[in-house]
Amino acid sequence: MIFLSHFSNLGDPVLLMAFLAFVLILVSLPFSFWSLSSNSNSSLVRLLIGVANLVLAFQLCTRWFLSGHFPVSNLYESLCFLTWTSTLVQLIIERRYLNPIIPAILTPFSLLTISFASFALPGELQIAGPLVPALRSSWLVMHVSVIMCSYSALLLGSLLSLAVLILSNSNELQIRGSSLGIGAYRTSNSTKSGYVNSRSLQQLFSNEENLDNLSYQTITVGFLLLTLGLVSGAVWANEAWGSWWSWDPKETWALISWLVYAAYLHARITRGWQGRKPAMIATFGFLIIVICYIGVNLLGVGLHSYGWFLS
């Protein structure tokens, strides 16, 4: 079995550090849920995620040193890089808004990505190999790192939007302030009895409002990075293959992702949408990014594939 075979490869320092990061994130997960249930912030969770982030940074640097190239040449390396950027984005978000709901939402995503890299991929895909000629370019660091950072920001921002949908629970919620400000929610629905606990309602709306604002800001950063990544990728493609755009499956899905999040930002900035409506668009964008990043890779098609099933 693929899962069991990986424990015999822990003599590799790169794989060992990835496993250590997995353990740290795994241990932090129940504490994240406990903090959420008790409505208390856990410094232990932030410490564990911070240490995992440092371990992954050291792991990537070690792979870079051993392989001689930027560590994003296959699906394993890119998943480790995605986990590193995701934990970093989580720590940055928690500095802006310290609330137990943040790690409870975002930690499972980092655990999923590092678990997939460590246990789901075959051993031969975890080994660093030589770069293909097209990747031997200074654009590798610029383009791929920016794209991966954009994926992290967009995916985590979309998860925050999903949390808004879950917390609002089908109520029509609106924010009286702007997307960048801190306003107050109002609901079009009332309870059947006409009585609402003001303390719990204020706390719920405050969480939703802050999550909505954080999602908007995080997705905005991710969208700008994705735009920069697409432009740099087009320049690199022209140098490598003589064409700015070849409608490769990865390029096509990246463009679809860009259009979805452009629609999200347009709805918020131009139409003034806030709360559930843009959150639905962002949640749909999450699925598109997953298809763009994982789906295309695992099918093993196109110039950008780090495929496994069919390669």
From Swiss-Prot:
Family annotation (InterPro entries):
Cyt_c_assembly, Cyt_c_biogenesis_CcsA, Cyt_c_biogenesis_CcsA/CcmC
Pfam families with a match to the protein in the record: Cytochrom_C_asm
Principal place where this protein is found?
membrane
| Membrane topology reported for the UniProt record | Multi-pass membrane protein
| One Gene Ontology CC term in the entry | plasma membrane-derived thylakoid membrane
Localization? Cellular thylakoid membrane
Provide the GO biological process annotations: cytochrome complex assembly
Its domain of life reads Bacteria
For this protein, the parts annotated as crossing the membrane are 14-34, 47-67, 70-92, 101-121, 146-166, 218-238, 252-269, 281-301
**NCBIfam families attached here?**
cytochr_II_ccsB
PANTHER family, per database record: CYTOCHROME B_B6 PROTEIN-RELATED, HEME EXPORTER PROTEIN C
**Task performed by this protein:** Required during biogenesis of c-type cytochromes (cytochrome c6 and cytochrome f) at the step of heme attachment.
Q: How does it assemble?
A: May interact with ccs1.
Give the protein's recorded name: Cytochrome c biogenesis protein CcsA
Specify the species.
Prochlorococcus marinus (strain MIT 9211)
Q: What is the lineage of its organism?
A: Bacteria, Bacillati, Cyanobacteriota, Cyanophyceae, Synechococcales
